[in-house]
């Protein structure tokens, strides 16, 4: 379900008539509202080892997001690698400040 939502949001963002910076901003907002759900779900399904630290979980999910980005690249002038780095960086920052197992919404 979350994959579908994320992909749909990415598709909508790619149609926005905004510059790269604004598009990047909306992309990051997409991640913000998807990553806690993803982490909770994968944690409950025991897809992640119990001894994974928060930073490791962020990188793990960042790689998953990177795969989605390869399919739904938001701007042909930006490489998918750039979006993947944004995703990983954002997730790492979030994990250092937020407990992903607490619903913050």
UniProtKB/Swiss-Prot annotation:
Source organism: Schizosaccharomyces pombe (strain 972 / ATCC 24843) (Fission yeast)
An annotated GO cellular component: cytosol
Chief site of localization: cytoplasm
Tree of life domain: Eukaryota
Keywords, comma-separated and alphabetical: Cytoplasm, Nucleus
Protein name: Uncharacterized protein C16G5.19
Taxonomic classification: Eukaryota, Fungi, Dikarya, Ascomycota, Taphrinomycotina
Cell compartment(s), UniProt: Cytoplasm; Nucleus
